[in-house]
């Protein structure tokens, strides 16, 4: 008879399980896309969740063409200010390095407070050879009453598409000092990858952190503990052993999240729930509805990018029948 075996509890794919350095998530890779030149990412602030009634667009579903209720996450997406752009080229080892940097004029003073070195950047012509183009954008925190921080977050977004990198450079030059909106990035019916920092849970025990089984009822001293720290040799505790420690506040990427709806700031009454969203308030700017849940607490910065591993095709539109505006306060 074979020896019964259970696969290890807790994935090693998420090591080290430590707190993220910043609440600002980092997009470390960008997919190659075809078509017209466009920005490959965007950012917003998580508001909360509600539910909608829509026509099931999945052709092979048993409810295809019928109204279904689905949960959605509301993300407030005010326009982003394009404050600069960068050109990258490959070094001898194949790594991308910055070869040129340009900044817009008449920037907000908050930008200089976060990056004072901007004033020292000399104006010069871009080089002839470069491999990648990325714009530098800043969030408009002052326009979002629901979040406490009023300092803008500054980060890069890749420019993709087109027939050459020169077209991407022209796109960056034309948008320098202007604003981009969510429609410049995506639209309802398409997929996006969501990158954010998860909710922090603090220091938690073995069972909650790894899902290991409780020890028998008659075990001495504790039950919510692992049975062993490992063998006698090797004579150290290996990192594969489940132990108590930090849980949450870690960067995670959710792939292939469908965009259900986009609305501008004139249409916020169609999404603001009665009494406001818990721990956030009312949406005042452009917003998007994303299918299902996404990582992070309300008010947290959420970044989106083009899907890296899209498996099903986009659809032209999502037919919404009803958006729940009932209070989320339990009354």
UniProtKB/Swiss-Prot annotation:
Q: Does the keyword Iron apply?
A: no
Q: Which UniProt keywords apply?
A: Ribonucleoprotein, Ribosomal protein, RNA-binding, rRNA-binding
GO CC term, one of those recorded: cytosolic large ribosomal subunit
Signal peptide from the UniProt entry: none
A Pfam short name: Ribosomal_L3
Q: One biological-process term from Gene Ontology?
A: translation
A single Gene Ontology MF term assigned here is: structural constituent of ribosome
Mind telling me which PANTHER family this protein's record contains?
Answer: 60S RIBOSOMAL PROTEIN L3-RELATED (PTHR11363), LARGE RIBOSOMAL SUBUNIT PROTEIN UL3 (PTHR11363:SF5)
Quaternary context = Part of the 50S ribosomal subunit. Forms a cluster with proteins L14 and L24e.
Q: What does this protein do?
A: One of the primary rRNA binding proteins, it binds directly near the 3'-end of the 23S rRNA, where it nucleates assembly of the 50S subunit.
Q: Which family does it belong to?
A: Belongs to the universal ribosomal protein uL3 family.
Q: What is this protein called?
A: Large ribosomal subunit protein uL3
Which gene codes for it?
Answer: rpl3
